[in-house]
C-alpha cells in the first residue's frame, strides 16, 4: 500500500525507492533484535546490555517492589532510578538489582522512550532533563558505562549499594575508595534466595574530583568534565570475592583500556556469532523480528556463575574451582524451561548442555538435592516438580554424556524422595491429599512425569529395579482423574474429591492455573490419558473444548494470560497442548493451532510477549514452533512436527552439522501434506532427535487446506508409555464424606462396557469380587475399592474411597453474650501461618468480625482471630476462606480449612459436623507481599450455598 501511494504521488521517486529496496541485502539477525519486546505488559524482560549468558545484566531500573518490577524495568514508566548490574529476565519473582549507578543527584530521572536505544550488548538513554547521555555495554563479568554530560552540568555519579528491587534484608554492605579512580564494594542480602553475595571493583577513566559518603553503602562522586570528555566506568562483578571481581575486570577489559566502543564491538561480535546459529528467510519483517528477539532472549539465561579463574560460590557457601574449559551456571527456571528451552539447546549447543548438567549436579553435591529454581549461589525453592531430572535424563538419552551418569541417577532418585511438596504422600499413597498440601494436583502430575524421566534414565543404565519403581509411580496421575468430570481433581486424604469443583476457578489444587490448564498434562503417556477419557473421540472433544470454552476465570491470577478458551499461552502448563492432536490422529489441528498461536501471541512491540517470558521458555516455544517441531515429552527424543513459519531456515547443530528446513509458501499454506528428510519420506507426525542431528534438508510440502491423511494412522502417533487399551479407573460421582443417616453410592467408568468389581471391606478387588450392577446404600463408615475389567483391555487401577458417617462435634456448655472476635496482630515475613507463633505481638484487641483493613503495613503482617461461633442447627457445616496470602481455620483443635502458604487470592473449603451451640474457632492469616485479602463464609445444613458468616453468630467470652 505504501508503494502504491508513493507511485501515485511521485512515480519517479517510487521507482528509485523500489529499486533500492530490492537491491538491499536482508537485515542481519542482530539488527532484527528488539530488546524492548517483552518490557511491557507482564513480559518482565529488560532492555539493558548483557553478553551471551553473561553474569552482568546492566540495565535501567524504573520501578521496584511490585510484580511488574521483576526485571527492574517496565515500558509504561517514564522515570528511572539508575542503572544496576544484575537483572532477571522474564521471571515472576523479584530479585537482584545490585550495584546501582546514577549519573545525577536527581532522583528519579525523567526520560522518554524516543531517547532510548537498545541492541544486543548495548543500551543508551539521553536523560535530557539531567543533561547526560548514558550508554551501557558489558562483557560477561564487567559492566561498562559511558556518561556524556552536557556542557555546564556538574558531572556527578551516585553509587548506591542500598538500592533494592524488592524488600530484601541487608546483612552487610559497603563502598570504599581504593584509588584516585577506583571504588570497591560488596553486599550480602536475603531476598528471593538467602545469602546473596556480590562484590565489585569499579575503575573510572579519570580521577574523582571529590567523593562523599552519605552512608557506608553509598558514594557520591564528582568529575572534572571541562575537557568535554565523557566519563567511562568499568565495573567488574563477582559473587565470590573482591579479588575475583578485580580479576574479571582486568582479564576481560584491560586490553581495551577505557575504549567503550571497542568493548561494545567485541560484545556485538559475540552476539553476532550466537545469533547466527539459526538464520531464517521469508516471513514478514515482524515475524523475523519476533524470531531473532526470541533467539536473543533464549541466550541471556542461564547466567555464568563462575569467574575467569574458574572459581564459583557453591550452594553450601564454600568456594570451589571448576576444571578448565567448563563454566558454572545459575538462574535455572526449571519448571518453565524443561519443556522447550532445554530440548532446544540439546540441538544447538551440546557443550552448554554438558556444563548445565554439571552445574545442576554440583548443586546437588553441595545441598543434597537437585535444584528447582537456583539463583546466584542458592536455591529459591520456587515452583513444583523436580524437573532437573527431566533436563538430565533428556540430555543423557540424547547421548550428551559429559558427566558421571551413575552419580546423576543417584541425584535424581534422592531428589525425588526428598522433595518437600507432598512427595511423602505421593510415594506412600499414590496421590497428594489436597486438604493437606496446596497445589496437590499439579505437583502430582509433574512428579509423575519426572518419575518417568528417572525410569528412562535407570533403564538406560541397566538399573531395572529402579526402572520398575519409578515407571509405576509415573502412572500415579490415574489416581486423581475423576471420570465423572474428566478432569484431574484435588482428592482429600479419605479419597473423596475436593468440593465444590469449578474447572474455571483458580483453586489451591493447581499451580498458576485452572483445572482446564492441567487437564492434559501427561506428556509421557498421552495414550494412557485418552483411555481415562474413554477413548480418542471423547479426548478430542474435550481437547476441542479447551480452545472453545469461555476465557473467563473465577478468581484472580496474573499468570493466566494469553487465553484462547481456557488454553493459556502466557503460562507454561498449556504450551504442549496444541501438539496433542498429533497423538490422536488429527495433526492438522496441531498445525492450525500452532500457526494461530504464533500469529497472535507474539508481536514486535513492548507488550508483544503475552505473559512472563520465563527465562527463555516463551521464546523457545516460538523458535521451535516456527521451525516446524516441538518437544512435548523431553526424554522421549521425539519432536512433534508442525508447519514451519518461514520459507527456509538454517540451523547450525551442536555436532557441527547443518540442518536446512524448507517449506513451500508457508505464508499461504499452513497444513502439511508431506515431509522428507534428505529425500526420505517421514510418515510419522514426529521426528527424532537423532534424525535432526544428521543434518541435511528437512522439507515440508504444504497446502492451503487440511490433509486429513498425513500422519493420522495410530501407528504414526508419537510415544506414549501405555501401548495397550486400558480400562479407565472407576469412580463415584457423589461425595461420601460426612454423610448423615445413609447415602447411595453409584460406581461408573468412562470405558464403555467395562465390568466393575468392588469390595466394601477395604480388600483389593479382583475378578472374583462382586460385580457392580446397581447403586447400593451405605449406612456406616467403610472403605470402598473398585477395579474395572474388559476383554482385550488391561484392567484399571484400583479406585479407593472412604465413606465416612458424620459424628457431631459436641457444643460447649457456655452462653457468651458479647459479640465480636479477639485479634492478635503480628508483623514480619511469613511463609506459613505457623510462622506467626514465632513473631512478636504488635497489637491485640477486639473487632466485630475478622478483618485485615486495620493492618498497619501494606505487606508482611499477620493476624490470629479467635472467639466462638454459634452453630444454629445440628448437621454438617461447610466453611470456606478466600485469602491472599495464607489462612487456616480451626474449629476447636480440628483444622477445617487449610488455605496456607504464600499465594494469590484463592478459595479453600472444609466440612465439619457440628452440634447446635457454641464452638471455639481460630482463624490464622498472613500477608506476604503484593495483594492482600481475607474473607470467610459458611454453608449451614439448611443453606444451599456459601454465604458470609453473620456477625451475630460470632462471640467473645
Language-model regions, residue ranges each:
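C-terminal motif of bacterial Sec signal peptides marking the signal peptidase cleavage site
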Residues: 20-21
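Accessory carbohydrate-recognition regions in carbohydrate-active enzymes
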Residues: 25-390, 396-445, 453-479, 485-488, ...
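Short proline/glycine-enriched turn/loop motifs at strand-loop junctions of beta-rich domains
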Residues: 151-153, 667-670, 749-755, 882-886
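Extracellular Ig-like/FN3 beta-sandwich strand-entry sites
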Residues: 230, 695, 742, 779-783, ...
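Beta-strand signatures of extracellular beta-sandwich domains
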Residues: 674-676, 755-759, 880, 888-890, ...
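Short, compositionally stereotyped local motifs that mark structural "simplifiers"
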Residues: 719-824, 830-834, 840-864, 890-892, ...
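Aromatic-lined ligand-binding clefts that engage carbohydrates, nucleic acids, or primary amines
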Residues: 747-749, 869-871, 875-889, 921
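Short beta-strand-plus-loop segments that form exposed binding edges in beta-rich domains
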Residues: 922-931
Amino acid at each position: 500500500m505504501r508503494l502504491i501511494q508513493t507511485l501515485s504521488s511521485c512515480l519517479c521517486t517510487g521507482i528509485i525507492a523500489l529499486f533500492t529496496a530490492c537491491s538491499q541485502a536482508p537485515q542481519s539477525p542482530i539488527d532484527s533484535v528488539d530488546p524492548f519486546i517483552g518490557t511491557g505488559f507482564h513480559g518482565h524482560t529488560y532492555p539493558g546490555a548483557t553478553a551471551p549468558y553473561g553474569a552482568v545484566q546492566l540495565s535501567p531500573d524504573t520501578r521496584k517492589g511490585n510484580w511488574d518490577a521483576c526485571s527492574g524495568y517496565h515500558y509504561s514508566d517514564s522515570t528511572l532510578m539508575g542503572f544496576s548490574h544484575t537483572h532477571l529476565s522474564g521471571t515472576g519473582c523479584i530479585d537482584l538489582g545490585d550495584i546501582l549507578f546514577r549519573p545525577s543527584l536527581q532522583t528519579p530521572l525523567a526520560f522518554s522512550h524516543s531517547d532510548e536505544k537498545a541492541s544486543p550488548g548495548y543500551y543508551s538513554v539521553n536523560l535530557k532533563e539531567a543533561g547526560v547521555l548514558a550508554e551501557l555495554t558489558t562483557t560477561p563479568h564487567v559492566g561498562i558505562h559511558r556518561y556524556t554530560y552536557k556542557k555546564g552540568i556538574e558531572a556527578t555519579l551516585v553509587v548506591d549499594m542500598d538500592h533494592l528491587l524488592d524488600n530484601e534484608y541487608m546483612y552487610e554492605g559497603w563502598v570504599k575508595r581504593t584509588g584516585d579512580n577506583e571504588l570497591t564494594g560488596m553486599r550480602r542480602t536475603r531476598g528471593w534466595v538467602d545469602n546473596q553475595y556480590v562484590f565489585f571493583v569499579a575503575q573510572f577513566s579519570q580521577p574523582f574530583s571529590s567523593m562523599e559518603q552519605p552512608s557506608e553503602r553509598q558514594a557520591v562522586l564528582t568529575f572534572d568534565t571541562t575537557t568535554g570528555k565523557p566519563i567511562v566506568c568499568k565495573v567488574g562483578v563477582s559473587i565470590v570475592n573482591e579479588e575475583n571481581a578485580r580479576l574479571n575486570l582486568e582479564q576481560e577489559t584491560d586490553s581495551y583500556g577505557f575504549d567503550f566502543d571497542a568493548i561494545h564491538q567485541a560484545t556485538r561480535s559475540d552476539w553476532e556469532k550466537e545469533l547466527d546459529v539459526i538464520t531464517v528467510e521469508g516471513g514478514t519483517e515482524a515475524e523475523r523480528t519476533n524470531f531473532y528477539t526470541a533467539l536473543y532472549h533464549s541466550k541471556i539465561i542461564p547466567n555464568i556463575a563462575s569467574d575467569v579463574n574458574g572459581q564459583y560460590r557453591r550452594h553450601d557457601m564454600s568456594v570451589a574451582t571448576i576444571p578448565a574449559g567448563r563454566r558454572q551456571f545459575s538462574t535455572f527456571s526449571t519448571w518453565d524451561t524443561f519443556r522447550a528451552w532445554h530440548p532446544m539447546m540439546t540441538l544447538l549447543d551440546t557443550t552448554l548442555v554438558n556444563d548445565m548438567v554439571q552445574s545442576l549436579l554440583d548443586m546437588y553435591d553441595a545441598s543434597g538435592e537437585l535444584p528447582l529454581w537456583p539463583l546466584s549461589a542458592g536455591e529459591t525453592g520456587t515452583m513444583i516438580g523436580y524437573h532437573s531430572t527431566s533436563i538430565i535424563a533428556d540430555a543423557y538419552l540424547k547421548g550428551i554424556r559429559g558427566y558421571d551418569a551413575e552419580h546423576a541417577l543417584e541425584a535424581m532418585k534422592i531428589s525425588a524422595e526428598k522433595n518437600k511438596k507432598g512427595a511423602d504422600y505421593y510415594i506412600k499413597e499414590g496421590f497428594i491429599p489436597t486438604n493437606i498440601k496446596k497445589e496437590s494436583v499439579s505437583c502430582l502430575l509433574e512428579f509423575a512425569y519426572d518419575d518417568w524421566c528417572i525410569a528412562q534414565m535407570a533403564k538406560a543404565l541397566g538399573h531395572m529395579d529402579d526402572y520398575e519403581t519409578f515407571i509405576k509411580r509415573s502412572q500415579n496421575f490415574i489416581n486423581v482423574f475423576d471420570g465423572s468430570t474428566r478432569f484431574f481433581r484435588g482428592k482429600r486424604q479419605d479419597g473423596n474429591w475436593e468440593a465444590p469443583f469449578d474447572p474455571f476457578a483458580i483453586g489451591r489444587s493447581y499451580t498458576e492455573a485452572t483445572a482446564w490448564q492441567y487437564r492434559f498434562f501427561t506428556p509421557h503417556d498421552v495414550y494412557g490419558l485418552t483411555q481415562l477419557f474413554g477413548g480418542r473421540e471423547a479426548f478430542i472433544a474435550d481437547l476441542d473444548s479447551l480452545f472453545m470454552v469461555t476465557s473467563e476465570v473465577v478468581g484472580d491470577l496474573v499468570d493466566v494470560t494469553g487465553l484462547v478458551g481456557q488454553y493459556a499461552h502466557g503460562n507454561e502448563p498449556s504450551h504442549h497442548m496444541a501438539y496433542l492432536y498429533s497423538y490422536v490422529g488429527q495433526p492438522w489441528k496441531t498445525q492450525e493451532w500452532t500457526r494461530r498461536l504464533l500469529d497472535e501471541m507474539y508481536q514486535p512491540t513492548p507488550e508483544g510477549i503475552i505473559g512472563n517470558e520465563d527465562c527463555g521458555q516463551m521464546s523457545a516455544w516460538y523458535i521451535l514452533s516456527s521451525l516446524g517441531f516441538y518437544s512435548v515429552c523431553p526424554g522421549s527424543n521425539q519432536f512433534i512436527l508442525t508447519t514451519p513459519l518461514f520459507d527456509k531456515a538454517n540451523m547450525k547443530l551442536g555436532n557441527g552439522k547443518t540442518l536446512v528446513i524448507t517449506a513451500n509458501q508457508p505464508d499461504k499454506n499452513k497444513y502439511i501434506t508431506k515431509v522428507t528428510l534428505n529425500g526420505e519420506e517421514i510418515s510419522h507426525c514426529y521426528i527424532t532427535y537423532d534424525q535432526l542431528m544428521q543434518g541435511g534438508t528437512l522439507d515440508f510440502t504444504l497446502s492451503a487446506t487440511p490433509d486429513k491423511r498425513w500422519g493420522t494412522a495410530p501407528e504414526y502417533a508419537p510415544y506414549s508409555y501405555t501401548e495397550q487399551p486400558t480400562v479407565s479407573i472407576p469412580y463415584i460421582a457423589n461425595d461420601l464424606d460426612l454423610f448423615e443417616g445413609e447415602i447411595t453410592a453409584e460406581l461408573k467408568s468412562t470405558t464403555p462396557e467395562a465390568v466393575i468389581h468392588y469390595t466394601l471391606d477395604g480388600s483389593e478387588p479382583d475378578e472374583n469380587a462382586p460385580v457392580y450392577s446397581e447403586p447400593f446404600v451405605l449406612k456406616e463408615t467403610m472403605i470402598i475399592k473398585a477395579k474395572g475389567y474388559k476383554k482385550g483391555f488391561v484392567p484399571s487401577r484400583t479406585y479407593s474411597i472412604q465413606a465416612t458417617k458424620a459424628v457431631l462435634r459436641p457444643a460447649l456448655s457456655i452462653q457468651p453474650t458479647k459479640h465480636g472476635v479477639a485479634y492478635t496482630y503480628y508483623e514480619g515475613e511469613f511463609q506459613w501461618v505457623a510462622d506467626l507463633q514465632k513473631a512478636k505481638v504488635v497489637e491485640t484487641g477486639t473487632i466485630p468480625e475478622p478483618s485485615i483493613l486495620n493492618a498497619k503495613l501494606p505487606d508482611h503482617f499477620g493476624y490470629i482471630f479467635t472467639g466462638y461461633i454459634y452453630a444454629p442447627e445440628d448437621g454438617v457445616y461447610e466453611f470456606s476462606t478466600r485469602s491472599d496470602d495464607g489462612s487456616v481455620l480451626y474449629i476447636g483443635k480440628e483444622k477445617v480449612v487449610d488455605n496456607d502458604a504464600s499465594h494469590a487470592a484463592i478459595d479453600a473449603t472444609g466440612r465439619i459436623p457440628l452440634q447446635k451451640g457454641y464452638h471455639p474457632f481460630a482463624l490464622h492469616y498472613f500477608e506476604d507481599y503484593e495483594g492482600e485479602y481475607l474473607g470467610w463464609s459458611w454453608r449451614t445444613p439448611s443453606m444451599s450455598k456459601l454465604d458470609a458468616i453473620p456477625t451475630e453468630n460470632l462471640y467473645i467470652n
